């Protein structure tokens, strides 16, 4: 048994002993009334609303954008298909466009690459964005902007400026970004 297995077994045993020491009413209440998915969803919605409201009240636009950009870079690291786009587009704008086309509408206009989530969408693709209210100049879109920036920078090996053209959360019919590659 390695240390990790030993620790897991010890914690399980300790928790089992603690459960025996809990009065009957408390133990049965804990096991028969776990929070349901709807309660957890409501909690997450409220928590995200509070977070974004506080960010709006306490932080300047630059700081908010930096925070959400960190989330966007994390999203890139967490999702293999995003890493695959960068890997398949490594070192070549044309290869990057081909890799992007598997999941997005993309086209080039001179030194600008357009990335669009179709002409019209019914809802935001980000699951986290669905759990807090839409606002004008919605900062959540900075997360997605940073994800695309990370894909471009990883593939091309240099800083790339990515801008939000429009987004569902900001009142547009779709999400549309431009990457300045020239």
What are these regions (language model features)?
Residues 1-14:
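N-terminal secretory signal peptides and thylakoid transit peptides that target proteins
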Residues 7, 159-182:
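Short terminal or interdomain "cap/linker" segment that borders an active site or interface and mediates
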Residues 16-20:
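Hydrophobic h-region of N-terminal signal peptides that target proteins for export
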Residues 21-57:
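C-terminal segment of N-terminal export signals and the immediately downstream linker at the start
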Residues 58-140, 146:
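Amphipathic interaction/junction segments at domain boundaries or subunit interfaces
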Residues 107-109, 156, 171:
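A short, structural micro-pattern
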Residues 144-152:
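Short amphipathic alpha-helical segments
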Residues 152-159:
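Short secondary-structure junctions
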């Amino acid at each position: 048994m390695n240390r990790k297995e030993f620790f897991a077994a010890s914690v399980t045993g300790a928790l089992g002993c603690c459960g025996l020491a809990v009065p009957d009413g408390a133990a049965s209440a804990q096991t028969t009334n776990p929070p349901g998915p709807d309660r957890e969803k409501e909690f997450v919605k409220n928590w995200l609303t509070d977070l974004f409201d506080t960010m709006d009240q306490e932080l300047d636009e630059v700081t908010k954008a930096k925070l959400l950009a960190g989330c966007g870079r994390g999203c890139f690291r967490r999702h293999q298909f995003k890493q695959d786009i960068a890997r398949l587009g490594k070192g070549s704008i044309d290869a990057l466009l081909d890799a992007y086309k598997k999941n997005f509408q993309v086209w080039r206009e001179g030194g600008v690459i357009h990335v669009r989530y179709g002409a019209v969408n019914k809802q935001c693709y980000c699951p986290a964005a669905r759990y807090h209210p839409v606002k004008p100049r919605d900062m959540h879109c900075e997360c997605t902007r940073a994800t695309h920036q990370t894909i471009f920078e990883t593939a091309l090996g240099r800083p790339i400026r990515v801008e939000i053209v429009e987004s569902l959360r900001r009142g547009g019919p779709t999400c549309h970004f431009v990457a300045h590659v020239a």
